[in-house]
Amino acid sequence: MFGYVRPCRPEMKCREFDLYRATYCGLCRCLRRRYGLLAPMFLNFDFTFLALLLWEPEERFTPCQGRCHANPLVKKPMCPDSEALELAADESVILAWWKLRDSIKDEGFWKAMPARGLSLLLRPSYRKAAVRCPAFDQQVQDSLVELEQLERASCPSMDQSADTFARLLQGAASKEGKQDRVLSQLLYQLGRWIYLVDARDDMEEDRAAGRYNPVIARFGPQGDDENLR
C-alpha cells in the first residue's frame, strides 16, 4: 500500500521542492547509518512525507551538503540528522517489514519468493527498529491481525476495514509516548484514503485471484467506479 503519497512538482515552489529533496536524501542517509546498506532500498515518497510531518516547528534547519552513496562524486543538499528523521527511519523499517510479511501471506509460494528473501535480509534491521519503537510495532501487528480477521469474515463494511488500517498509520504520530492530536488525525485520514484507493486499484487482480477486497465485498463482483462516487 505504498506509493500513493507523491510530491506534485509543478505545484511546489523551488524552496519547497528543495526542502523535500533534502529530506528525502537525509532520510536515505539516516536509514543507511542506522540500519545498513539494505534499508535505503525501501525508501520512498511516503516515508519522506512522514518525516516532514514528524518534524517539530522549532526544528527547522538549513540543509547541509553531503555525498550520496549512489553518486559520491556530487554533493547534494541533505537534512542534518534529527529526531524526526530517526523516528521516520525506524517506523519506515517496521512498515517495510510488515509489508513484506503481508505480501508473503497474500501471494503464492513462488510469487512470494522475492518477499521472503528480502524479509530475511531485513529481519535484523526490523528487530532493531522494533526495540526502538515498540509501541508502533505493536500497533502495526495488532492492526494487521484485526485486518486479517476482517478479511477472513469477508467484512462488507468498507469503513470498518479502512478504520483498522487508518489506526495502523495513526500510530506513527506517537513520539516518546505522546501523541500529537493534529498529526494523529491527519495520519488517520490519510490511512483511510490510502486503504480505499489501494482497494480500488487492486479490484481486478483481487477479483481474478478470489482474494478479499473491501470494495468487492461492499458492492459485489460487478462493483465499479460509479458505485464509489
Question: Where in this protein do the model-derived segments appear?
Answer:
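Acidic catalytic motifs of isoprenoid enzymes
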Residues: M1-Q185, R192, L196-R229
